[in-house]
Amino acid sequence: VMNTVPGADVLVIDDNSPDGTGDWCDERAAADPRLHCLHRAGKQGLGTAIIAGIRYGIAQGYDHVLNMDADYSHHPRYIPALIAGMQDDGGPGHDVMIGSRYVPGGGIEGWPFMRHLMSRTVNLYARVLLGLPCQDCSGAFRCYRTEVLRRLDLDSVRSRGYSFQEEILWLLKRAGARFGEAPIVFKDRERGQSKIHAGEALSALWIIFRLGVKNWLVTLRKVVPASST
């Protein structure tokens, strides 16, 4: 990351990982002021980890916050395209740029057919229920404009796990954010195993459904004004 974007600071969020990530990060952070480590006690969920990173970026006064997985699935070579999308050739730019597996030029390597099918289905499910203006609603490789993140009530976020990805896009849409996507090729992790399990997946679908009902009710109120008395 630092070789690709030398001017960037890097925050590693470690939930007491047993593989020594925390110690590795502390050792390198002591020698490089661009690297920072946030240690949390135990597994608190993907959503809370990203929120912690967002809060850190806002507190530090950064213009943008970029989130990516640290398991070799997201290649740093895609970062410049995400940053470029925030400027949009001198125009207003986008408020969130998504590293997308599902736009032309994007893709996935190393997944079995059923996982492809599940991912496509969840993305369609989220787009329909939440009205999200993007093809990849569940990917974690994203760049956000902190000016727009400040508009969000992060304390109101319900998702602690993987459905956070869809929920924050829904909140950003409601806040008037401009969305963009740039193609990436996602590689299945080279080490370790995915932490998602059936219970987590069902919980994510339920949270997205509840948000979808709320989204429909808000839309209905706009379409059908309250009757006068």
Where are these regions (language model features)?
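Short, acidic, metal-binding catalytic loop of nucleotide-sugar glycosyltransferases
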Residues: 1-9
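Hydrophobic helical membrane-anchoring modules
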Residues: 3, 131, 155-229
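A structural signal for isolated positions on well-ordered beta-strands in alpha/beta enzyme cores
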Residues: 9-11, 36, 180
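A conserved acidic beta->alpha catalytic loop
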Residues: 14-23, 72
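Conserved N-terminal glycine/acidic-rich loop preference
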Residues: 21-35, 64
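Acceptor/aglycone-binding surface of glycosyltransferases and processive sugar-polymer synthases
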Residues: 34, 38-59, 64, 76-162, ...
